[in-house]
């Protein structure tokens, strides 16, 4: 099955941005239609999310996996929809509201690469290819790389300073943790 051109272009653009190549922005569509279509990235990243679920917190012997799957899937959808809503007034405060759609388009497609990178690092750790002493460090470095990637995207798409980009990354992190902790409390 062939990947639709707009998806392939967006993922290629996200890859180029991960390499800190601003030219990656040229591969993203713009406008309201592209904004709504960028949420297809949530469906593409969902299998990686599902693979990461058993690695999260939980009591292995008594876990009701159907309940966990339902709660975590709802949390996943909330995460994909809450961040754009929270960031809209932030872009307004920063005087960059006109770039909000473009930012969310790029942010959404970048999530596919982020899930893939975290999944790959965890796979290497679980496979035993990395010495035990490095396993936690690899994951820590992967998360730092994800934060830097998101900051780079915020900086170049919204044309803002590094501190403002860092604030957006922090908002994303705090919102994500809030949603995760809430979901975990409902298992």
Features from the language model and the residues they span:
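Selected alpha-helical membrane-embedding segments in polytopic membrane proteins
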Residues: 2-104
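Alpha-helical transmembrane segments of multi-pass membrane proteins
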Residues: 37-40, 105-117, 171, 175
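Alpha-helical transmembrane segments of multi-pass membrane proteins, especially transporters
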Residues: 72, 76, 102-110, 139-140, ...
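Residue-level signal for the membrane-embedded core of alpha-helical transmembrane segments
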Residues: 77, 81, 85, 111, ...
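C-terminal halves and exits of single transmembrane alpha-helices
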Residues: 82-83, 109-127, 185-187
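Terminal transmembrane helical module of multi-pass membrane proteins
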Residues: 124-187
């Amino acid at each position: 099955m062939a990947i639709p051109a707009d998806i392939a272009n967006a993922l290629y653009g996200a890859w180029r941005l991960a390499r800190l190549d601003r030219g990656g922005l040229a591969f993203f569509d713009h406008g309201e239609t592209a904004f709504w279509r960028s949420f297809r990235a949530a469906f593409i990243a969902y299998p990686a999310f599902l693979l990461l679920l058993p690695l999260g917190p939980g009591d292995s012997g008594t876990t009701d996996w159907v309940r966990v799957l339902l709660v975590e899937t709802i949390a996943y959808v909330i995460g994909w929809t809450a961040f754009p809503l929270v960031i809209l007034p932030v872009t307004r405060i920063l005087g960059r509201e006109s770039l909000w759609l473009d930012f969310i388009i790029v942010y959404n497609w970048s999530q596919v690469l982020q899930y893939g990178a975290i999944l790959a690092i965890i796979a290497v750790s679980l496979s035993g290819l990395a010495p035990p002493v490095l396993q936690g460090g690899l994951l820590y470095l992967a998360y730092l790389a994800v934060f830097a990637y998101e900051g780079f995207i915020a900086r170049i798409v919204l044309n803002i300073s590094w501190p403002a980009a860092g604030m957006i990354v922090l908002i994303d992190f705090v919102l994500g943790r809030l949603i995760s902790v809430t979901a975990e409390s409902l298992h």
